[in-house]
Regions:
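Single conserved hydrophobic/aromatic residue that forms the stacking wall/gate
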Residues: 1-9, 13
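Alpha-helix N-cap/helix-initiation motif
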Residues: 2, 22-23
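Alpha-helical hydrophobic/aromatic positions enriched in membrane-embedded helices and signal peptides
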Residues: 3, 18, 136-137
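Extracellular/periplasmic envelope-modification machinery, especially enzymes
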Residues: 23-139, 144-177, 181-185, 189-210
Length: 210
């Protein structure tokens, strides 16, 4: 396995990679990590210009609510990048019910605190992004916490199916079974360092990665 470090991209791109008021990275940072992954995997990354930039407006994240000096923090702005092509997405809940949902949700008129829900509609046990223009393309699975939400849509340009699993919520099968059942070619882990260090998180990952 090969780790992909967002710091490798930050040496080249001097734009905002993390929100000021939130613990998440921006969609731009996720794109740069996607580019780094493609280089390692021997794939051609899609150009950012191929995506449609969407402005979801001002955003106040988790740091804002937890900071005693929150009034001094400047608002962030959430930008999202809609992938081109015939892209569909299905959300599967923990009770097995499934429904279609847009890859990017228009949260421009929603609460200033909810804008990160733009990406994949938030956190769900299983999300399947399908590029119907690549019927013979490979399949990948992204094991993630919420950091994976803005990252996964970019992969739709290189894979037929992108399966996105939130290991904190998914318990239908272990990774080894999932890889066999869905004919997975590549496995990616996208997670924040803070979550990776939590004991409960490691227990969940240990179970899922059997």
């Amino acid at each position: 396995s090969t780790p992909i470090k967002s710091s490798a991209a930050s040496d080249v791109y001097k734009r905002q990679l993390y929100f000021r008021t939130d613990h998440h990275w921006t969609a731009l940072a996720a794109y740069y990590s996607y580019v780094q992954f493609c280089k390692v995997a021997g794939m051609e990354p899609a150009a950012l210009e191929d995506f449609t930039e969407l402005d979801m407006g001002p955003f106040l994240g988790s740091f804002y609510g937890n900071c005693s000096q929150s009034s001094k923090l400047r608002e962030d702005n959430v930008l999202a990048y809609d992938p081109p092509g015939d892209i569909t997405m299905t959300i599967t809940k923990d009770n097995g019910s499934a429904f279609e949902w847009p890859v990017l949700t228009d949260m421009s008129k929603s609460s200033i605190y909810a804008k990160y829900m733009t990406f994949l509609g938030g956190d769900h046990p299983l999300v399947t992004i399908t590029n119907n223009d690549l019927p013979d393309g490979p399949n990948c699975v992204v094991i993630k916490d919420s950091f994976g939400n803005p990252f996964a849509p970019y992969l739709s340009q290189n894979y037929h199916n992108v399966y996105v699993i939130d290991y904190r919520k998914y318990n239908a099968m272990t990774l080894s079974y999932f890889v066999q059942y869905y004919d997975i070619d590549d496995v990616l882990l996208t997670e924040s360092l803070a979550m990776a260090q939590g004991e409960g998180t490691l227990d969940l990952l240990e179970w899922f990665c059997k």
